[in-house]
Every structure is written in C-alpha cells, then in structure tokens.
Regions:
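Replace the tail clause
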Residues: 1-300, 304-308
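Short, intrinsically disordered, charge-balanced linker/junction segments flanking boundaries
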Residues: 309-316
Length: 316
C-alpha cells in the first residue's frame, strides 16, 4: 500500500472497531492463534550439521557452473546475486579458488555484456542467451540493489587496483541509474522500469551503426572496437546491443591509453549518447514502492559505503 491507501485501511479498521468491536476482537484472537501455531522455538539440541554434506553440495554446485561465460549452464541466465554472494563468501573463507574465480568471471561477464546498460548504468533482469548478450530489458530494483551489494563486496575482496576501480564504477553507475530513474520525491524507490518503449522491446537501449557514426564522429573508430559494433554482432533490425568483449584496461593497452584516459574517454562518450537517448520514448516505470525492495537497496548502499567510503551512499 502507498501512504494514502494505508491510511484508508487504518481508518476503516477504526470505524469497524467502533461499530463492531466484538468482531474485530475475535479476528485479532484468531490471528494470534494462527501466529502461535506457526511459531517454532529453537531446539536445545546441537545442530546436526555435517561438513561432508556441505562439501558434497559444493561439488554438485560446481558441476552446474558455466566456466566459459559465468553464471550457470542453463538459459535464460539470471544474475542471481545472492548465489554469487554465497560463492564469494564461501570461496574466501575456505580459499576455494574455483568459486572465487567463477564469481570474478561472472561479475566481469555480466557487467561487460548486453545485460548491463553501458550508457546509464543498471542491470536488466536476465539474459536470453548463454553469453549475457541479449537481455530481457526490464530493470528491477531488487536485482540492482543486490548487485550493488555484490559488486561492493567483490571490491572489498580484491587486491587489484584496476579490478577495484571496475567494481566501483559499476556500483556508482548502477546506483546513479536508480537515483535518476526510480527515486520518488518522498525518498523511496520504485519497483521497476519496463522493457518496452515506443512499441518495441529494447528500442530505448539499442543503436544502429549509422546512428553511432553520426553521433560519435571520430570517437566511433575506437568505440566500435570496444563495444563490438560488427556485422556478426548485430542483434535484429540493424540494431546493436552494446557489449564489451574485453576489459577497459586491456582495451586501453591496445590504444596506448593510460587507465585514467580510458575512463575519461568512455565517460565523455557515455554522456553524449545518454543525452541523445533521452530524446527517445522512455520505458514506463512501475510506480509501486515496496518496503522489502527498498530495504535491499539500503543494504546495498551500506555495503558500498564500507567498500568505497562514500559518504553520499551512507547518507542516502
């Protein structure tokens, strides 16, 4: 319920209690009984946890992992940040190199793939293929909130400065997307942004090669290499979904750019494309605001503050 509807419900309860107090009391007693029936005290006995069972489950888990593109072997592919966060925690606590490397690969693949919005930030709900290339373009608050926490935790657990910066950029861009598109005047965040705009799925997010050439001019020569603008990567109707085949750091080396220069060039082009894209019909917003999903975002922002010591994240 939003605030208006919730107040309406509360007033209705008050009126019912005034006119039919016995009925309300009977309902309250029934509710209490139902809660008591579902309450289970913690047993005094020690847990029957067995390390062998967990290790067996981990072995079975590893058999389901996609070692080439991250995530699981089945499609469609969902990011499933809670799964990855478990693997990251278990991998670090048990020094399980396989799980640690799998999480790292998955985080790079989804952030470089088409499931990530390379212009305004934020992740789509899932990929329709094994390569994270073609997403279902809907963006959900709960996914992005958990991914903010996950990328923040990954940043805390790396000693590589370039990798840390990569994770940080993804977190900041993703939160920037949520702040700009889903935040309400009251401070809460809305549930989702639709996949469709102007009668087509993904139309807001995709580009033709001719559009990019016209907008980017001389920058197109390197942009097409970084974001795989080639005939064989075209999606449909001459449209391209932006995606990277390598990290920005590796690409920068080929261009003889320093890392700071690479980030500056990409950020400059993103601003240009973002301004052009905002002239299109935007996907509609789901105007519900759910406490549980907002709580996930609060958790993500707390993790990001710990990882990056960004006061704005904590204040938000």
């Amino acid at each position: 319920f939003n605030q208006h509807k919730w107040l309406k419900v509360l007033k209705a309860i008050v009126e019912t209690y005034k006119s039919e107090p016995k009925r309300v009391e009977e309902f309250a007693q029934e509710m209490q009984r139902n809660l008591e029936d579902n309450y289970h005290e913690r047993p005094d006995a020690k847990s029957n946890y067995e390390a062998e069972r967990l290790e067996g489950w981990i072995t079975s888990l590893k058999e389901t992992l996609d070692n080439s593109f991250g995530g699981y072997k089945y499609v469609p592919k969902f990011p499933l940040p809670n799964h990855l966060d478990f693997m990251l925690s278990y991998g670090n606590s048990m020094n399980d190199v396989v799980l640690k490397n799998h999480v790292r690969k998955t985080l790079f693949c989804i952030a470089n793939g088409g499931i990530y919005d390379h212009i305004e930030g934020g992740f789509a709900r899932y990929s329709t293929d094994a390569y994270w290339k073609v997403p279902h373009f809907e963006k959900m608050l709960y996914d992005n909130a958990q991914l903010i926490a996950l990328y923040s935790n990954a940043a805390r657990n790396t000693s590589d400065a370039s990798e840390y910066r990569f994770y940080q950029a993804i977190v900041y861009e993703t939160f920037g997307y949520l702040f700009d598109n889903l935040k309400t005047p009251s401070g809460s965040y809305l549930c989702a942004q639709d996949a469709d705009s102007g009668g087509s799925e993904g139309g807001y997010y995709c580009w033709t090669e001719s559009e990019l050439k016209k907008i980017l001019k001389t920058d197109f020569s390197w942009f097409k290499d970084l974001y795989n603008i080639r005939p064989e990567t075209c999606w449909e109707n001459d449209l391209f979904i932006l995606q990277k085949s390598e990290s920005l750091v590796d690409f920068a080396r080929k261009q003889n750019w320093k890392e700071d220069e690479a980030y500056a060039n990409v950020d400059r082009v993103k601003l240009t494309l973002s301004a052009c894209r905002k002239m299109r019909i935007k996907p509609s917003i789901d105007t519900k605001s759910l406490t549980s999903w907002n709580a996930l975002l609060l958790d993500g922002l707390c993790h990001s503050y710990v990882a990056f010591n960004n006061q704005e994240m904590l204040d938000e």
